[in-house]
């Protein structure tokens, strides 16, 4: 069954923009997107050089936000392709005031565009 669009989705995503990694300019073809890399600078994104853990398919963010709360010395990146779902994860991170978690609203096939090789400590 298809999930209904959340009310005020665009406004809610804008309110959580500090937790969302921009994917502007993402091409429709994943192979083209991978060739045209736009690697994330983790030190710039998080403001530190801590290890980075990736969760693919983070859903509503319960697991990743709890991990980020328990381990402030680790940076977390959650990936979820559905904006309708990722907004809930971003709101949880914002409510928990978790500076060590960010979200990428994209399909896992596009990750090689954003994630530098051998830069993730754990998936």
Q: Which stretches of residues belong to each language-model region?
A:
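Conserved beta-strand/loop positions that form the S-adenosyl-L-methionine
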Residues: 56, 79
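Short beta-strand element of Class I
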Residues: 74-77
